[in-house]
Amino acid sequence: MIFKRIFLIVLDSFGIGAEPDANEFGDADTVNTLKSVMTSDKLNIPNMKKLGLFNIDGVEDGEKEPNPDASFARLQEASKGKDTTIGHWEIAGIVSDTPLPTYPDGFPKDIIEKLEAAFGRKIICNQPYSGTQVIHDYGKEHMETGALIVYTSADSVLQIAAHEAVVPVEQLYEYCKEARKIMSGEHSVGRIIARPFVGEFPDFERTPRRHDYSMEPPGDTILDLLKVAGNSVVSIGKINDIFAGRGISRHIAITSNEDGMEKAIAELDRNYYGLCFVNLVDFDMKYGHRRDVDGYAAALTRFDEQLGEFLPKMKRGDVLIITADHGCDPRGAGTDHTREYVPMMIYGEGIKKGVDLGTRHSFADIAATVSKIMRIPYATRGQSFWNEVKE
């Protein structure tokens, strides 16, 4: 049969256990996002169970499905990183052997001076910080002085937080574009992130108008090849930001995981050849980093409910792949991402059920498989598993 469309859904930060080199990335060898959320009574994911989530190599918790509807694998990250950018690039075919720069002690003095000159404003904070805590600790000073809150994390990011009443959102976006130009060469961070917030001290709240300005991928991804070949490449959520707009033919903004799945379900009613690439960031942003086990579990439960709406609406020729880009164990130390294996489940008419693909050694196996499904030649270090799962 002819396969015409792939829905690739990334559950941002849904790791399933520590990778062998987790210690090199500052993580304990016990980190396990799935295991942590399974301690919550808010978790109820029968549809993912039926697809084979608990049958995946290394997943020791949860009841195995005797007859899984999907084929499945555990994916190990080949790239040197544990962040959104590196993870998504690898899913799309690019393995990063060199880690992107990080700033555990804050940004160098010369960089701060360049940013201040470009913005015409002073900078405060300049250290790794939790996004919610930083606006609590520096928001009042920002509102009194107009100085911008610039901070980072364990990831390769420069984040700029500003109150919408002090810096209009469009102006904040312009500052981020300027920062993207300045953060080049050895300082080419993966993402510049606009972090607008509202409210009064001490009850500041971040708004959904976050915007990411990513470094462009260093080579062609499967998205580029699909688009050049005339296929539609639809991004839902922050995919467009992660790839700096490269290889995207249509972008759909979302406000939440739930909104993202509603948009994905709506795409099932459209008719096109290509890829619909979905990122659901709430797992990471709202629950993983905030170490909110119950919140993470409840979000997975809601995703699973919507997955139950999605699956029966799939058409002949549609393929669904569910995966993740890294971990963010809500019971882990600190507030940052965790270096973890991720799940992969592939489902659709014409795809074998219950094939256990074991542990595979690159997220790029997904890109290699997408290239085979869509019959687009693409050179990547990933290895396709299409022959093993197609009927």
Model-derived features: where do they sit?
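Feature captures the catalytic ectodomains and active-site-proximal regions of enzymes
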Residues: 1-391
